[in-house]
Amino acid sequence: PILSFTFPFIAEARYSAIVIDSDNGKVLYSRNANTLRYPASLTKMMTLYMAFDALSQKKILLNQELLVSRRAEGQTPSKIGLKSGNKITVENAILAIISKSANDAATVLAESLAETEILFAKKMTQKAKELGMKRTNFRNATGLPNRRQKTTAKDMAILSKALLVNHKNYYH
């Protein structure tokens, strides 16, 4: 299988891209793959990775209900309209992140796994380093703008491969 990532137009360098063979890690194409970029909603790939880790370690269950905070309710712009005080299952939060890029669901997961989204982002960065994502720094679980939240196309390819290898049971 081939994995590829392209980052959108940026003035100083038109784009970043990488295509790798996920079976052997061979780079088939690369352009500015080590250039720092804002990850935007690709951040949610790590949010999902962290949720899959927690599921694998039995720290959470798919049918477990998570409480929606005011902060989660207030997330914009892409969301499913969760209301503070209501609950969503882990499974539905994951599906909302995958299908809608739901920032409210990503925040609920983050707060449930680490008390606050800031603590969760620190754990995301730590996990990134463990996976070999040397230039990645997360500041939130959603990818909403933060000037210190950066990654590279190469690092996102590493995360993609880790998702496929370490959490293939969640792909169906």
Question: Where do the protein language model's features map onto the residues?
Answer:
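Extracytoplasmic/periplasmic beta-strand context in beta-sandwich domains
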Residues: Y15, Q64-L66, T136, Y171
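A conserved catalytic-loop motif detector
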Residues: T89, A93, S101-H172
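Active-site-proximal loop and beta-strand segments within enzyme catalytic domains
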Residues: F52-L119
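Bacterial N-terminal signal peptides
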Residues: P1-T6
